Amino acid sequence: MLQLREPQMVHKHLKLAVLGIVVIFTTYFIISSLSSPTSTHKTEYNSPKLQLAKELELNSNWKELGLNFQPNKKYSLPDESTLRQQLSYQFPYDESKPFPKNIWQTWKVGIDEKSFPKRYLKYQQTWEDKNPDYKHYVVPDKQCDLLIEQLYSQVPDVAKAYRIMPKSILKADFFRYLILFARGGVYTDIDTVGLKPVDEWISNSEMILEKKNRSGLVVGIEADPDRPDWADWYARRIQFCQWTIQSKRGHPMLRELIAKITDITLTRHKKGQLKKVLGKNEGGDIMNWTGPGIFTDTVFEYMNNILQSPEVFKNKKKWATIIDWKLFTGMEQPIAIDDVLVLPITSFSPDVNQMGAKDSHDPMAYAKHMFSGSWKDDGMPEMEQ
């Protein structure tokens, strides 16, 4: 009898042990599934895209009060070519440094020449008077050429692209990006008037909407045409102006813009198309070669690159448009996306009496463009149709 009961007891204890193990593992997996989301859900939840959506939901009145969005994680494109590597090496970006106290302007001749227009003397003086602590440069065209040759001697493709541009308006556009990338500060057209000291611009404040100001690039709205025929008048639905730009030395957006313009120029040169109009007209061609079209596109691309998930770059997944013109249309206060600060139309385009722009006395009015159109008479041969 004892020999029969002993195996039964062992079998009973074994069943209890197995049952206990099953219960323990089942409980563990249930608790794990409830307390720890999968890596996919975690990545999606923490993605900059969803962070931005949550921020906009919490700040539904961002267009009236402004926005300062700083993603917890940001991803940047790796250097795609030796040109970008050369630019990054020669002019490294340090966002911790303040904006350089430089003001850059250009004109055909030097400011001491008799042929320098008197009205431009008056305009440029407003920048000097309001910014006595700044170095103010009014660079004549010939000096622009020499300066770019010197600054970009170690990036020969860029120097060549600038040198072979067939029209002075193309060079004038390219120069502003090149000088800001190499030296930083404020670039402003010679036909602009300074309304407030640069040190009083919101871009130079320590905080923006109770968050640390990390601005490295400052752009303003040029056009916000809320009308069905906007494409007949402007290159983009929201267009950033490039008659006044503030930037720190080596900003990555300018690096991408310079690389694009260099590639376009050298490709056109190789194909014998430097003087050909490749767009629907000469104005449109310039807009998308060096002007507000390509400038606006590159600013948007930079902001969107910051907000992409890492899988986009690692696995070459589809690039998503997270930020477009809808975020900025109708804005009345600054919007910061990481280190890009976008100013409302009033900041650089007051008194235009349209698209929501206010007058020159508004607190957000920093500079006024007088629209002299001096670049139109550039003394260069006409481009071929």
Curated annotation (Swiss-Prot):
Domain of life from the UniProt record: Eukaryota
GO biological process: cellular response to heat; cellular response to starvation; filamentous growth; filamentous growth of a population of unicellular organisms in response to starvation; N-glycan processing; protein N-linked glycosylation
TM segment ranges: 16-36
InterPro entries: GlycoTrfase_DXD_sugar-bd_CS, Nucleotide-diphossugar_trans, Och1-like
Keywords carried by this UniProt record: Endoplasmic reticulum, Glycosyltransferase, Golgi apparatus, Membrane, Signal-anchor, Transferase, Transmembrane, Transmembrane helix, Virulence
Lumenal face of the membrane: 37-385
Location(s) in or outside the cell: Endoplasmic reticulum membrane; Golgi apparatus membrane
Enzyme Commission code(s) on record: 2.4.1.232
Residue span of motif DXD motif: 189-191
GO function term, MF aspect, one: glycolipid 1,6-alpha-mannosyltransferase activity
Consequences of knocking out this gene: Results in a temperature-sensitive growth defect, cellular aggregation, loss of outer chain elongation of N-glycans, hypersensitivity to a range of cell wall perturbing agents, as well as to constitutively activated cell wall integrity pathway. Finally, leads to attenuated virulence in a mouse model of systemic infection and affects inflammatory response and the efficiency of neutrophil phagocytosis by the host.
Principal localisation: endoplasmic reticulum
Cofactor dependency: Mn(2+)
Catalytic reaction annotation: Transfers an alpha-D-mannosyl residue from GDP-mannose into lipid-linked oligosaccharide, forming an alpha-(1->6)-D-mannosyl-D-mannose linkage
Gene3D superfamilies the record matches: 3.90.550.20
Topology, Cytoplasmic side: 1-15
Membrane topology: Single-pass type II membrane protein
Gene Ontology annotations for the cellular component aspect, listed alphabetically: endoplasmic reticulum membrane; Golgi apparatus; mannan polymerase complex
Family of this protein: Belongs to the glycosyltransferase 32 family.
The protein's role, per its UniProt record: Mannosyltransferase involved in outer chain elongation of asparagine-linked oligosaccharides of the type Man(9)GlcNAc(2). Adds the first alpha-1,6-mannose to the Man(8)GlcNAc(2) and Man(9)GlcNAc(2), but not Man(5)GlcNAc(2), endoplasmic reticulum intermediates. Represents the first enzymatic event required for synthesis of outer chain mannose linkages on yeast secretory proteins. N-glycan outer chain epitopes play a crucial role in the host-fungal interaction, virulence, and host immune response such as interleukin synthesis or phagocytosis by neutrophils.
Comment block on domains: The conserved DXD motif is involved in enzyme activity.
Protein name as annotated: Initiation-specific alpha-1,6-mannosyltransferase
UniProt gene name: OCH1
